[in-house]
Design a protein with these regions (language model features):
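Transmembrane alpha-helices
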Residues: 85, 118-150, 173, 177, ...
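Short cytoplasmic-facing helical segments at TM-TM junctions of multi-pass membrane proteins
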Residues: 91-137
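Generic hydrophobic transmembrane alpha-helix motif, especially the helices
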Residues: 20-23, 30, 40, 53-87, ...
């Protein structure tokens, strides 16, 4: 993966993006784990966290870029703050979910073993919920890298900024190259974090410091030697280009012309089929669905959603749903809200059906499940 990044001349922006992720991801993990544990221990805290998490996850990303720019200015620090706000909620939710799934027998066994509250939390509860917490770590890494392009709008450097420039110039092939670099970083970090979390400690006694850490010492020495070689090589490469240290952007390989030609071939070959599908989808599915939502009377919408809230959560949920819909109805964005609602309903329905079918089929085979998870990582991080 890093060979691809270096050969295609994206090493420097990739390291800028990697440094951003290596700062924001641990911060998101610590904040998310702490809030998740706090929410698990206190029902009031969980009730207070739920609306905050809902707002943080559903508010459009560009909406909170403006206050961040006003309060903190532009640059990498502003991009880091925006990324932390965007990537922390999944960690909080999955921590609470994982801790809630722990059976009472596990907690009772920990208490019977003499654990105090601190030991019960860190020696029993969190290790037992490790699977869900690791999913949260995966989502944090994916969300941090997915935010790189949006953070570039407020001055964050790295692959996101280069991608924004390529898209503004309609260079599809170059944008795809940069997007693949983002995916590579995401996959590498996800696999490393998963391997570190699943690594079993070596409890064999009578091992000295070197025997316990010989691999770490070897790779540290190898890294130092390679750094020295790269520094010395700068005196031998002509024109000042040290390819052992950094491959410049204009000296790297590129497949952007091939990717541009491939996109043009798809467009020229399948234009009529794609256009026919678009027309069918607009005229027979999305168009009628949009009109049905827009023609729905306001009072019927109130009754529908408040009734659903009452059935699911009782009178309290009914009143909350009704007050929120009333706020939208009194604003000037009722029709825009219905248009957004119809698009979200269609997208959620298609995503849920396809996700359940594909996930159920792939869960029957280890190879298929690993393959589909890699594909999911690709689509979650590809800008």
């Amino acid at each position: 993966g890093f060979f691809y990044v270096s050969v295609f001349g994206q090493w420097e922006p990739s390291m800028q993006t990697l440094s951003l992720v290596l700062f924001t991801a641990p911060v998101c993990f610590i904040i998310g784990l702490s809030l998740g544990v706090w929410g698990y221990l206190s029902k009031r805290v969980e009730a207070a966290l739920q609306p905050i998490l809902n707002v943080a996850q559903t508010m459009p990303h560009f909406s909170y870029l403006v206050p961040i720019v006003v309060l903190f200015g532009v640059g990498d620090h502003a991009g880091s703050i925006a990324t932390i706000i965007f990537a922390t909620p999944p960690m909080v939710r999955l921590t609470i979910l994982g801790l809630k799934k722990i059976s009472p027998e596990v907690i009772e066994s920990g208490l019977m073993s003499g654990c105090n509250r601190f030991q019960l939390l860190f020696k029993v509860l969190i290790p037992t919920a490790r699977r869900d917490i690791l999913i949260g770590v995966n989502q944090v890494i994916m969300q941090c890298l997915a935010m790189t392009t949006i953070a570039a709008f407020i001055g964050a450097k790295g692959l996101g900024f280069n991608l924004k420039v390529a898209l503004n110039s309609l260079k599809i092939g170059k944008a795809a190259e940069i997007g693949i670099c983002v995916v590579i970083i995401a996959v590498v970090l996800d696999k490393l974090s998963l391997a570190w979390a699943n690594k079993q400690k070596d409890y064999f006694a009578n091992l000295n410091f070197y025997q316990r850490n010989r691999l770490s010492i070897f790779f540290i020495l190898l890294t130092v030697c390679c750094s020295v070689v790269a520094f010395i090589a700068s005196y031998f490469f002509p024109e000042g280009f040290n390819y052992l240290y950094l491959i410049p952007f204009n000296k790297g390989l590129t497949v952007s012309p091939i990717l541009d030609a491939f996109v043009d071939w798809i467009w020229n070959t399948f234009f009529y089929y794609l256009n026919s599908f678009n027309i069918f989808l607009l005229t027979n599915v999305l168009g009628p669905m949009k009109q049905a939502y827009l023609n729905m009377p306001v009072i019927s919408t109130f009754v529908l959603f408040m009734g659903a809230g009452y059935i699911i959560g009782g009178l309290r949920s009914c009143l909350i749903v009704g007050s929120l819909i009333l706020f939208i109805a009194l604003s000037e964005y009722w029709d825009r809200t219905l248009i957004t609602l119809y698009m979200a309903t269609f997208a959620v329905g298609v995503s849920a059906i396809s996700g359940i079918i594909v996930g159920s089929l792939c869960s029957q085979n280890d190879f298929a499940s690993k393959s589909i998870l890699s594909i999911c990582d690709f689509f979650q991080t590809f800008p």
